[in-house]
Amino acid sequence: MTIDDRGQIRSARRIVVKVGSSSISGENAGQIGPLVDALAEAHGRGSQVVLVSSGAIATGIPYLALTERPKDLATQQAAAAVGQNVLIYRYQDSLDRYGIVAGQVLLTARDVENPTHRSNAKRAMERLLDLRILPIVNENDTVATHEIRFGDNDRLAALVAKLVEADLLVLLSDVDALYTKPPQESGAERIAHVGWNDQLEGVEIGSAGPSGVGTGGALTKVSAARQAAEHGTAVVLTATSLVVDALRGEPVGTWFAPAQETAVESAPAS
């Protein structure tokens, strides 16, 4: 189905949710529980849910006795190898409360670009969803190199949404929406709705926080949202703390209308 407004979110067949490193690692690791609560609620309504989760490298950093994100590729790969294991354990531990089983899917850019690999990935994802498994997707940082990386999981999330033909993509961040200028500045206004042909210039989404563990920003999120919308997937960009409201169709964050949408959302900005 094509979702033309937030009121249809509760009946979405397939939903992809993307969460960034800074939202679920370090001092924010406790947000995994509430995030899973929201995913489980949507799953319980009958929606097929896919989670695209960053955080392998960031989660692995303290286990390697490092104090900051490593700059060299080999140490990044080592941190990812350790962190991905811990991250999946944390998700499954939380999902156990709902009797939901997670399935780990690790992809590289080549897996999506190569037709044979893409077909295999799609088949596996389709089967997982048919079995009511909740796929948790991440870039395969342990084998990815600088030349074949997605660069950020916002782009990966858009590609996954296309791969599984999702009705909705929810891009989670540290702030609640796109703004006309940095949200901490006076006069900043939330952008509640972005139509397919709307031009976005000078928008802000705020910083990723002081941790420096993520790789995405406003431009990557807008680009990913546009990419998903181009293929008929509605997009909500909002804060991780608002994921429950977003998946209930509440007027939070910024709504990106899918390409074939004709109706304009009437919810006022706040």
Swiss-Prot record:
Record flagged with keyword Transferase: yes
Pathway annotation from the record: Amino-acid biosynthesis; L-proline biosynthesis; L-glutamate 5-semialdehyde from L-glutamate: step 1/2
Gene Ontology MF term list: ATP binding; glutamate 5-kinase activity
SUPFAM superfamilies (alphabetical): Carbamate kinase-like (SSF53633)
Binding of substrate, residues: 54, 141, 153
Location(s) in or outside the cell: Cytoplasm
Protein's recorded name: Glutamate 5-kinase
Organism of derivation: Leifsonia xyli subsp. xyli (strain CTCB07)
Taxonomy of the source species: Bacteria, Bacillati, Actinomycetota, Actinomycetes, Micrococcales
